[in-house]
C-alpha cells in the first residue's frame, strides 16, 4: 500500500485530477476546498440529524451499517428523517461530481466526468419548494437547535463556494448547470433549516425587544 504523503507538494505545487499541475493558491483549489468543506459540513448535519432521531440505540458499527444499506435508508429512522438524509446524501454526491468537473481542465478528458443536468437543478428547486412552506416576514437569527445551526453553516459555506466558483469563471468556462446548482444550494439550506427548526424561529425583533 502506497503512503498517503507523496512530498510532491512540498514546494507549493499540486495536481488537478486531469494531471495538470498548478500552484496550491490557485483559484481552482479555493473552489475545490470550499466544495470539500461544504460536503464535510453536510456530513456533520447528517450525523446530527441521525443522532437526534434514531429510535433504537445500536452500537456505532451497526448504526453505520444500517445507514448505508438500502439506498442509505435506515430501519431505525422515521420516514421523514430517512427522506432528509437521502436528500443530503444526494447533494453530497452532486458535489463530488461538481468537484470532478472543476478538477478536469483538459477538454478531451471532460467527457469521462459525470455531468450535472438541468434535471438536477430542477430537483433541487423541488426540494426548496418542499420545505419553503411558511412565509418569511423578517430576518432570522440562527441557533434554534443543533440541526438548524449546522444547516446554516452549510448555507453560508455554500455561498462562499459559489463566490469562489464565479471567480473561477474569470479563468475557465464553468458549466452553467453547475453554476445554477450552486446558486440554488444556499436557498435549499435556508428552507431546509427552517424545517429543521420546526419553523420556530428567532427573529431580529425578538432580540431587539429583549435589549
What are these regions (language model features)?
Residues 1-211:
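Phosphate/pyrophosphate-binding loop motifs in nucleotide- or prenyl diphosphate-using proteins
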Amino acid at each position: 500500500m502506497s503512503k498517503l504523503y507523496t512530498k510532491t507538494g512540498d514546494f507549493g505545487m499540486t495536481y488537478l485530477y486531469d494531471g495538470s499541475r498548478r500552484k496550491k493558491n490557485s483559484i481552482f483549489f479555493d473552489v475545490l476546498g470550499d466544495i470539500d468543506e461544504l460536503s464535510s459540513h453536510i456530513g456533520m448535519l447528517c450525523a446530527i440529524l441521525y443522532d437526534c432521531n434514531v429510535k433504537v440505540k445500536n452500537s456505532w458499527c451497526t448504526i453505520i451499517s444500517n445507514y448505508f444499506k438500502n439506498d442509505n435508508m435506515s430501519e431505525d429512522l422515521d420516514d421523514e428523517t430517512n427522506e432528509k438524509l437521502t436528500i443530503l446524501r444526494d447533494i453530497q454526491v452532486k458535489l463530488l461530481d461538481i468537484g470532478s468537473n472543476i478538477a478536469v481542465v483538459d477538454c478531451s478528458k471532460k467527457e469521462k466526468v459525470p455531468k450535472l443536468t438541468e434535471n438536477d437543478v430542477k430537483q433541487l428547486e423541488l426540494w426548496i419548494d418542499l420545505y419553503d412552506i411558511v412565509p418569511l416576514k423578517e430576518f432570522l437569527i440562527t441557533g434554534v437547535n443543533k440541526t438548524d445551526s449546522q444547516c446554516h453553516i452549510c448555507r453560508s459555506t455554500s455561498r462562499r463556494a459559489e463566490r469562489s466558483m464565479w471567480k473561477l469563471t474569470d479563468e475557465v468556462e464553468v458549466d452553467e448547470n453547475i453554476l445554477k446548482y450552486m446558486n440554488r444550494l444556499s436557498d435549499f439550506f435556508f428552507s431546509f433549516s427552517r424545517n429543521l427548526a420546526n419553523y420556530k424561529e428567532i427573529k431580529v425583533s425578538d432580540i431587539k425587544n429583549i435589549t
